[in-house]
């Protein structure tokens, strides 16, 4: 899923690839954090 996350989320900028920040660093995990 693309666009699962955005810069504004402050959690990640790679969307479904993963989250970079206080959330987690993993594909599926990062995608959930965007929610």
UniProtKB/Swiss-Prot annotation:
This is Unknown protein 14 from 2D-PAGE. Residues 1-35 are annotated as: Disordered. The lineage of its organism: Eukaryota, Metazoa, Ecdysozoa, Arthropoda, Hexapoda. It comes from the Eukaryota. It comes from Bombyx mori.
């Amino acid at each position: 899923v693309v666009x699962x996350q955005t810069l504004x989320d402050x959690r990640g900028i790679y969307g479904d690839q993963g989250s970079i920040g206080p959330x987690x660093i993993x594909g599926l995990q990062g995608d959930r954090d965007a929610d």
